Amino acid sequence: MAWIPLLLPLLILCTVSVASYELTQPSSVSVSPGQTARITCSGDVLAKKYARWFQQKPGQAPVLVIYKDSERPSGIPERFSGSSSGTTVTLTISGAQVEDEADYYCYSAADNN
């Protein structure tokens, strides 16, 4: 993907279906470096199950950035945060950096309590 100056595309998967659960995300979110990016994920299962967020850069394995809706694993920068409201979860990247350009996936499954 070509870098456009002052534009930080955060590309995300539109729809993920896992164990008959359908989760929907917008096709893309674009922000300038330093701005706040918010990526939503919605699905009925999210009212009962936690969401996890993964970041994946080209040629690399996915990295867990948020679990249990809002918990951040060790080593993940504080600019990454998660929240939940009803059937929607949100990944927020406050002060997005160029290195945050990636695909972001939300995930929830039957074994995810």
UniProtKB/Swiss-Prot annotation:
Superkingdom of the organism of origin: Eukaryota
Entries under PANTHER family matching the protein: IMMUNOGLOBULIN LIGHT CHAIN
Gene3D superfamilies, alphabetized: Immunoglobulins
UniProt-annotated stretches for the region Complementarity-determining-3: 107-113
Membrane-spanning parts: none
Residue ranges of the region described as Framework-3: 71-106
Framework-2 as annotated region, ranges: 51-67
Name of the protein described by the UniProt record: Immunoglobulin lambda variable 3-27
Region (Complementarity-determining-2): 68-70
Keywords, ordered alphabetically: Adaptive immunity, Cell membrane, Disulfide bond, Immunity, Immunoglobulin, Immunoglobulin domain, Membrane, Secreted, Signal
Gene field: IGLV3-27
Ranges where the record places region Framework-1: 20-41
Record's signal peptide: 1-20
Lineage of source species: Eukaryota, Metazoa, Chordata, Craniata, Vertebrata
Annotated compartments: Secreted; Cell membrane
Disulfide bond positions: C41-C106
Record's GO cellular component terms: extracellular region; immunoglobulin complex; plasma membrane
Organism whose genome encodes this protein: Homo sapiens (Human)
Region (Complementarity-determining-1): 42-50
Role according to the record: V region of the variable domain of immunoglobulin light chains that participates in the antigen recognition. Immunoglobulins, also known as antibodies, are membrane-bound or secreted glycoproteins produced by B lymphocytes. In the recognition phase of humoral immunity, the membrane-bound immunoglobulins serve as receptors which, upon binding of a specific antigen, trigger the clonal expansion and differentiation of B lymphocytes into immunoglobulins-secreting plasma cells.
